């Protein structure tokens, strides 16, 4: 009987650790995505040739910067250390953007914004559906409408950029 109780306790401990690990993974991925959005947004604000793309970049830098601050405060309250960098995948995307100019930059940036926001929407929905920490889930719920709005605007601008780059 004591052995069964030990296994049950161990199982519950592993489940709790797994849940914490999933919430921690969400925070880390959201932080990396947020860092990438700010960097790419600042780049677009300075480099885009289309005024709407430039404005979108400024909005991304500002709004994701504010979200990053909220996320940092949340992570600190949970004792979770945020990553120091945006990660290799995001860095490669940023390097490609830095090497691209003119209308091609605008189109590439907007395509990257659609893809990045689609991934972030899914990440947020996954956390809302299966996250264990109420505060982390609440953060995801709070951010979802904004990220969905960014995605909608990115898709709209991507359509414009595709049409403009074919002429």
PLM feature spans:
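His/Met- and acidic-residue-enriched segments that coordinate or traffic transition-metal cofactors
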Residues: 2-167
């Amino acid at each position: 009987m004591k052995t069964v109780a030990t296994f049950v306790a161990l199982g519950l401990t592993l489940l709790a650790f797994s849940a914490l690990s999933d919430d921690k993974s969400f925070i880390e991925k959201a932080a990396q995505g947020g860092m990438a959005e700010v960097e790419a947004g600042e780049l677009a604000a300075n480099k885009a040739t289309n005024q709407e793309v430039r404005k979108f970049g400024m909005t991304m830098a500002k709004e994701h910067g504010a979200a990053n601050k909220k996320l940092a405060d949340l992570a600190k309250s949970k004792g979770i250390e945020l990553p120091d960098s945006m990660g290799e995948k995001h860095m490669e995307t940023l390097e490609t953007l830095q090497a691209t100019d003119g209308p091609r930059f605008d189109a590439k940036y907007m395509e990257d914004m659609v893809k990045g926001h689609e991934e972030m929407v899914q990440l947020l929905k996954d956390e809302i559906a299966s996250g264990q920490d109420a505060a982390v889930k609440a953060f995801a719920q709070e951010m979802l409408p904004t990220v969905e709005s960014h995605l909608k605007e990115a898709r709209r601008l991507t359509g414009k950029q595709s049409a403009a780059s074919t002429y």
